[in-house]
Amino acid sequence: MISGFANFIANLKNEFNSDYIVFALDSKGKTFRSDIDPNYKANRPEPPKALLDQLPVCIEMIEKMRLCSFCQEGYEADDIIASFVKKYSKNMQINIVTHDKDLYQLIGENVRVYSPAKKMLYDRDGCFEKYGVWPEQVRDFLGICGDSADNIPGIKGIGEKGAKKLLENFGSLEKIYENIDNLPQNRQKDLLIEGKENAFMSKKLASLYDGLEVPDLLGAEFPTENPLLKITEILKEYNLNRILSALENSKDTDKTLNFKAITVSTKAQADKILNDLENVKEIAFDTETTSVDSHNAKIVGFSFCWDEKSSFYVPLAHSYLGAPDMLDKNMAKRLIEAIYTKFIIGQNLKYDFRIVRNNFGLNPPAKYADTMILAWLMDPDNSVGMDNLAKRYFDYDTIKFENVVKKGENFSSVDVKNAANYASEDAWITLKFYKKFCGILSTELLDLAKNLEFPFIKVLLNMEENGIKMDISSLKEMINEIAEQLKILTNEIYDLSGENFNINSTKQLGEVLFEHLGLPAKKKTKTGYSTNESALSAISDLHAVVPKILTYRELYKLQSTYTEPLLALALKNDENRIFSNFLQTGTSTGRLSSKNPNLQNIPAHGSMAVQMRNCFVSKDGFSFVGLDYSQIELRLLAHFSLDKELLRAFREDEDIHSRTAISIFGTSDKEKRAVAKTINFGLIYGMGASKLSNELGISRSDAKDYIEKYFKAFASIKNFMENLKSEAKKNGYTTTLFGRKRYFDFANATPMQFAMYERESVNTKFQGSAADIIKKAMVEISPFLNENARLLLQIHDELIFEVRDDISESFGKKMQEIMQNVVKLNVPLKTSLSINKRWGDLK
């Protein structure tokens, strides 16, 4: 908690850019709500002792940082916030930082709620989108469906969906009861009549009191100096070394960090810059556009900086009434062509390269560096966003996008002068990032960036632009088939459970399974019964409805997450191709991640996985060529551990899972091989006996016995794993095959975090090293790609190409050779090659 709170303080100014800050604190003891209902908050479990011990430290931190806090006996922090809102919201914008949904009732014209978990600001529309009710209906909503966290009862039997529908029709709790005689005679009406007293009491409990006498804001000003500098002793006491390091960096920084923002809008200015550029070697470059979607965004302007004293902005397409003259696009292209002959520095260059290619037809430059990637190599678990980096390394508050661009508008509507300040700052701070990282990153990591991560940017750029074709008719057929199956399953579930309910509501589902049907449940939490996959799988043999629910969920997710969204995307493109975005810095291990849409999560297993993947097809005259590294993480285990038996098995090309099965069970039949496969891969991810017993459906003692036999068969592996964890604890990081580091704060970890860090330190070694290898393979493959052979997807250890039919086999074999020889390990790398017209048919 202390670490999290310190990080929260460190990011406050950066995230909110506020003039004032007030911490509202709960009072000790009972509040006036306990007089309304003695059971209010009565069932709350006692907070963990570690949390109770750390809370006073956090309050001490607030006091020592001289930040404003307020507490009122008999009232909750929420009431204090409501009173501040009432007093000040007419004249200033207020952001409420909270996890609690009851505070959404305070949202208004100048009041928004910020969710720390989602890192999102919610206004009136955001409240409706999140909860399905307007801010003024939040109290009514809680009056109906209650709030288990605070033991607010609500109306028993009416959940969130029912509450939303009632409020949509009637507007408020009072109006519902005014019209209750007009409601159809059904179970819901009976529940409303029976629960009326609870409903109005619950609404009263959920209503915030805003009549407290709160102080003025004198003394609540946001400090100009970093408040954490006042509590360095506390930070040292709790070993918050990363924060202390950032503070140390900020002390060494020139706090003025001034530069001159220059707007370039005439040919004469551009000609002078072209002349000045002749003596420039390195230049930071950034684009401003109409959208974050680089595939469709239009350029509005671009900025560049080479000496930290001045930074330039070239406006091209500002379209507001009264916008000044801007540089001719042909002249702008000449400028970019000249800039591209230099060493380019950018923050998320893949985006800028695509914008320039799409808007000017220019291919990326030969030499470049990306500070986002350098920041990620420095600390892969931390934010690599520009605003956060500026604050972390220079204690500098950048101009925020939302303070420049009005809601619902884009950068083209921004006044050119304001745009110049914002955009010029982006280029200027990017240049500073580059110089900073060149000074603090190790030579090994700088070399890794130069030789692997930077060239990989172009590989991803081209892969994303290729997209992949969808078979529209197959998708539609699948959508109809799933819809029909869901309809049948819904009726079967209703029949087996004896009632109709919202199957997608975890609350209603939990009540049906564990209360109405009486099935055994794990302990009920404040949010209700657990109905996740593992919880349902554990009781799937106890009632016929449970397997139906699991099948329903699988199909519903397939429909809502994949088939319907993919169809919508495919129909937007003339060739029915969809285009994903691959994130190079999206994971801590080094693996790529994919979004909009996430093509790496297309189901590979399940009843309809092949059918789903077969909706992805090659274009006419071309085939998919799939190349998949075989057991790469197990081969890395052999490489790192030097276990003699494992080395021998791979060198002799044995079936490693059969070999493991024989070592543990003395036989390698299909069933035993499957168990061995689970053990082989599970141990790499830090799986213990408890997890293995759940995975295999066996007793914990049997699972423990299997693991002991495994380590007996492969004697060196256990020592290697233990040494790997010990090194991570000693050094505070794990290193991958190519030298990337992932850091773990073992010193300040809770027991649960400590165990997680141990697992992740092992996982990162293998998953991160596998990511290194396939990235290097993709870079080495890229010179062989052209209009006849294009790389479409990377699915972790697998590459999928679209290749002209007549060369598909020879191309596949050539790529196979490259992939298998991209790095020299103590065991051979092996890939499987498959060629087909549909993704699902690749073996």
Predicted regions and their residues:
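Noncatalytic, basic helical substrate-engagement surface that gates or grips nucleic-acid strands
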Residues: 1-97, 101-123, 198-215, 219-220, ...
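Conserved RNase H-like, two-metal-ion catalytic cores of nucleic-acid enzymes
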Residues: 1-20, 38-50, 59-64, 253-393, ...
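Short alpha-helix plus adjacent loop in nuclease-associated cores
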Residues: 42-53, 109-133, 189-191, 315-329, ...
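Accessory alpha-helical DNA-binding modules that contact the DNA backbone or grooves
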Residues: 112, 117, 134-137, 141-206, ...
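Conserved "right-hand" nucleotidyltransferase catalytic core of DNA-directed polymerases
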Residues: 191, 195-319, 344, 362-364, ...
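Active-site palm subdomain of RNA-directed nucleic acid polymerases
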Residues: 441-452, 456, 775-799
